C-alpha cells in the first residue's frame, strides 16, 4: 500500500510542520507515504493539480460533509481502499474554500475528520495523525503518543 496526502497550500508554521513530519516519519515505518503540497489558486488551476497528484489512486476527498468515521472505521477504510487497484490511496484536502466541486465529485469516497471546520493546514495534521493511528490499529499495535 502507498498513501498520498495531497493538500492545497504550504505549511510554513514550523511547529505545525515539525508535527506533520514526525507523523509522516512514523507512517513510513509501515507504508510508503507521500505528501504533495499544491499552490493555492482558483479551482480551474487547483483541480487539475489535485487530479495529477492522485492519478491512478483510489481517491478520498476530505470534506466537512463527508462520512464521519471513528478511528477503527477510518483504519478499516484505509485498508479496504488500499487493497484495490494499484494499492495507492490519495487523500485530498482543499484550500480555504475546500475542494473544487469537480474534484469532490470525481473522488471514490468522501470522508470527514470532524463536523467541525478546521483550517486546512490543521486538517492536514489531523489527517496525517489519523493515518498513523490507522497503521497501528491495522497491525494490532499500541498507539505511541
From Swiss-Prot:
SUPFAM superfamilies attached to this UniProt entry: alpha/beta knot (SSF75217)
EC number in record: 2.1.1.177
HAMAP family to which the protein is assigned, alphabetical: 23SrRNA_methyltr_H
Domain of life: Bacteria
PANTHER family (alphabetical): METHYLTRANSFERASE (PTHR33603), RIBOSOMAL RNA LARGE SUBUNIT METHYLTRANSFERASE H (PTHR33603:SF1)
Function as written in the Swiss-Prot or TrEMBL entry: Specifically methylates the pseudouridine at position 1915 (m3Psi1915) in 23S rRNA.
Top enzyme class: transferase
Quaternary structure note: Homodimer.
Annotated S-adenosyl-L-methionine binding sites: 94, 113-118
Family to which this protein belongs: Belongs to the RNA methyltransferase RlmH family.
Gene: rlmH
Protein name (record): Ribosomal RNA large subunit methyltransferase H
Catalytic activity from the UniProt record: pseudouridine(1915) in 23S rRNA + S-adenosyl-L-methionine = N(3)-methylpseudouridine(1915) in 23S rRNA + S-adenosyl-L-homocysteine + H(+)
Cellular component aspect of the GO annotation: cytoplasm
Subcellular location field: Cytoplasm
InterPro entries cross-referenced by the UniProt entry: Alpha/beta_knot_MTases, RlmH-like, tRNA_m1G_MTases_N
Organism: Sorangium cellulosum (strain So ce56)
GO MF annotations, alphabetized: rRNA (pseudouridine-N3-)-methyltransferase activity
Keywords attached to this entry: Cytoplasm, Methyltransferase, rRNA processing, S-adenosyl-L-methionine, Transferase
